[in-house]
Amino acid sequence: MTQSDHTPPLLLPPRWETARLVIEDGRSPDVSSLHAIFSACAYVAPWDDTFREVPLADLAALVNRSQTAVGEDYRFKLQCVREKATGEIVGYFHISHGAPEPHTVWVSILVFHPDFQKQQYGRETIDGLCDQLLALGYEAIWLKVYLKNWPALRFWIGNGFTTILKYEGDKTMTPTSYAAIRLERKLR
């Protein structure tokens, strides 16, 4: 099953599960937990501008945007990753369905609190996400990784994002230069 280019993209369900995790749409009461998770990952900012300091209001706006059912924002979804055993939010991601192409999904961020990294929650989330998106008829997931963010490169490549679609960035290397690659994982 594939989607017609003229049909709106199908969206992830508001709640789904993996063996150890519950993934569900972010809600306003989750914002302070999401902000704490993001802030705990600020150590990555020197390698990846995505992790620069973000005000709490910006995360609240992303949660609100994720709850929109009209306009182009309906394609955007922020979901919290919770441990089944405790119910604690350990990470989150946001994606855009049908972007940048109709049969793809763009992952704009996937982040786990450092206390919950190296427990295979990221792999479990990505494997579950791939299963969900494949069932909805998507063909691929795209994302961007900063080349200075070696832990992220290892994570994404180790999780099947091995096709380089595009290089972005400066042509010469300096301490402040920017470079990133767009990666793809086929779902079929």
Region spans (language model):
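Acetyl-CoA-dependent GNAT
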Residues: 3-21, 25-117, 126-128, 132, ...
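A generic structural signal for beta-strand entry/edge sites
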Residues: 102-104, 140, 180
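Short loop/turn motifs at secondary-structure junctions
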Residues: 106, 137-139, 160
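Conserved catalytic-core motifs of GNAT/GCN5-like acyltransferases
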Residues: 142-146, 157, 162-180
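Conserved glycine-rich acetyl-CoA-binding loop
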Residues: 88, 113-127, 136, 147-154, ...
